[in-house]
Amino acid sequence: MCIRDSGYLDTYNDYDNKTVSIGENINGLGVISTYNNNSKQTSSMGAINDGTGKLTIFDSEGRETLNLVRSLTTFNQDGKITGKYGTNNSGNGSVFLYDRFGNRGWYKTGKNS
């Protein structure tokens, strides 16, 4: 099987709900997405514009809860960022914590002060 020019392949369960989609994202890059029994997206794995891989996890309602690109980013049930763990521009490890509204509350870097 060969699908060209913005093609994708979807699979469906016995209830006619989409379960998996394999193909291209809006930027023409590869992506695989999974869905639950309510047709809500549960995960997405693929490439982004700079060629980096990206993994996104969604809750049962299709809301983003975890994003892994160059850092691990978490979100609450309202879609607000709650934490970020990764590497800062200087190459040091960094951790950000946010309140339930997405406001930054705490930051720490691995470099000794």
Cite the ranges covered by each PLM segment.
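Short, small-residue-biased leader/transition segments that mark boundaries at the very start
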Residues: 1-3
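Fold-core signature of tandem repeat domains
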Residues: 9-12, 18-22, 30-35, 42-45, ...
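Short, low-complexity, Pro/Ser/Thr/Gly-rich segments in the mature regions of secreted, periplasmic
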Residues: 97-113
